[in-house]
Amino acid sequence: MTRIKLCGLTRIQDIEIANKLKPEYIGFIFWDRSSRNVSAIQAARLKGKLDPEIKTVGVFVNAPAEQVISYYNVGIIDIAQLHGNENEEYIKKLHDAGLTVIKAFKMKKAGENINLAGNANIETPEKPTGNAITETYGKSTDDVITEAVKSSADYIMFDPGKGEGATFNWQLIKGIKREFFLAGGLTPENIEKAVETVQPFAVDVSSGIETDGHKDPDKMSAFVKSTRAL
C-alpha cells in the first residue's frame, strides 16, 4: 500500500479533514519563505487536534539541528523532513535524538536539462538563488540519485521544487532499491500514473490539493481516494 502525506496544513479545518481521510502523515512547514509556513505555537495547536494515529512531519530548510530536535522533544513533530544542505553529520544528530528522518533531493523539473548519458540536453534555466532543496544544479541526475540512495536518512524524497506544483520525469527513478517519497506536481488526476510508474513507498502532496492557496477538502478527499484505490 502506498502511504500518503498531506503537506502544508495550516488551519484547524485542514486538520479536521485530515482526521476524516486518515493519511499516514501530515506535514507542517517551518520555513519562513513558504506561504504555508507555520510557527511552533501554531503547529502545536494543530497537532493537538490531530488524530494521534497520523504522524506529523516537520519540514525544515537548513534549520539548526537543535531547533528540529526541540520540536520533536515537545511533541510537535514525529518526523523531520530536510530540504536544505543538511549533511550526514546533521542527520546523525537527529538520529541520536530519536528522530526519523526524510531527506529530500531535488530533481530537475520536466523540461530542464537532465544530463543523463543518451538523453538529449535541453537548455537549463538560470540557476535560481537560494536553496530550498539539496542543490542539484551542476550535478547530473545520476549523481543526485546515487547520493540519495546512499543517504543515511530513514527515507529519501525525490522532489523537483518547493511547492511549485511541478513534476519531473518519473522514469528516472523507476526501480530505485530503497523506500522513497515521491513529491512534485501530484494531483488526484495524475496520482494513478505516478504510483504505477515508480511504486513509491509514499506520495507527498501540497499544491495539488489546494484552491486559491488553501487546502481544498474536495481535492484532499479525491487525492486520498484515488491513491487508496491503487
Enumerate the predicted regions with their spans.
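Conserved N-terminal beta1-alpha1 strand-loop-helix module at the mouth
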Residues: 1-117, 122, 137-158, 163-230
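Cationic, low-complexity basic patches in intrinsically disordered or flexible, solvent-exposed regions
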Residues: 128
